[in-house]
């Protein structure tokens, strides 16, 4: 498993986790279901239906508003596929030299402690689901509140799994910090408006967009504090 750490405003750290090649090959039933949902969502995105386009637009806004901490925990959740021996062989954290290891560890500890928060959110999602039943009785309008609560319940459940796995990873005490000058150079180019090197270095199509959203979220927090 590989974790990329990049600096954010307010002394925070953006953590991006994605599995090793070995972990990626272990396809589960859950993975197959999620892939089908993605394909279904893509078909709605391509549809010319006004209702479907509105639902997709609303859904995308919700996705973009998801806290970056939650995205990290949801990404780390599949680590449960690994046993302890495999975990020892696959985990490391790559970061630019100007980002201190202590700051990264503090962010990891902060993320690990979000389990209770997401548990409370999950309970709220489940309690709210019965309230959306009346929408089912309206045949021309999809039960968007129900779909939303189901989606948020799933997200919070995955975040809980992620926090549990993160605690497990940190208890093993085999987190290896690796400074990367290439990452530092790519980050400098990114701040100057060129995101291509950073995208190419990470090799994940959504990485730069997620990092931009994380920066924007912390900047909004700064404005609120001021």
Curated annotation (Swiss-Prot):
Keyword Transmembrane helix: yes
Compartment(s) of residence: Membrane
Disulfide bonds: none
InterPro entries assigned to the protein according to its UniProt record, in alphabetical order: Mit_KHE1 (IPR018786)
Membrane topology: Single-pass membrane protein
A GO biological process held by the record: mitochondrial potassium ion transmembrane transport
Protein name, UniProt field: Uncharacterized protein C23H3.12c
């Amino acid at each position: 498993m590989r974790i990329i750490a990049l600096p954010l405003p307010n002394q925070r750290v953006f953590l991006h986790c994605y599995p090793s090649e070995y972990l990626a090959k272990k396809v589960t039933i859950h993975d197959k279901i999620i892939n089908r949902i993605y394909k279904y969502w893509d078909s709605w995105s391509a549809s010319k239906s006004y209702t479907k386009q509105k639902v997709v637009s609303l859904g995308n806004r919700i996705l973009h508003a998801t806290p970056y901490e939650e995205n990290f925990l949801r990404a780390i959740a599949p680590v449960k596929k690994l046993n302890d021996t495999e975990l020892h062989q696959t985990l490391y954290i790559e970061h630019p030299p100007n980002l201190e290891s202590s700051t990264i560890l503090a962010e990891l500890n902060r993320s690990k402690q979000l389990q209770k928060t997401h548990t409370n959110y999950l309970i709220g999602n489940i309690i709210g689901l019965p309230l959306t039943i009346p929408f089912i009785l309206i045949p021309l309008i999809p039960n968007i509140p129900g779909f939303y609560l189901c989606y948020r319940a799933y997200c919070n459940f995955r975040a809980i799994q992620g926090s549990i796995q993160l605690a497990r990873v940190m208890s093993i005490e085999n987190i290896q910090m690796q400074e990367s000058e290439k990452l530092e150079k790519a980050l400098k180019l990114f701040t100057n408006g060129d995101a291509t090197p950073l995208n190419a270095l990470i090799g994940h199509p959504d990485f730069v967009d997620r990092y931009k959203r994380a920066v924007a979220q912390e900047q909004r927090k700064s404005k609120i504090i001021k």
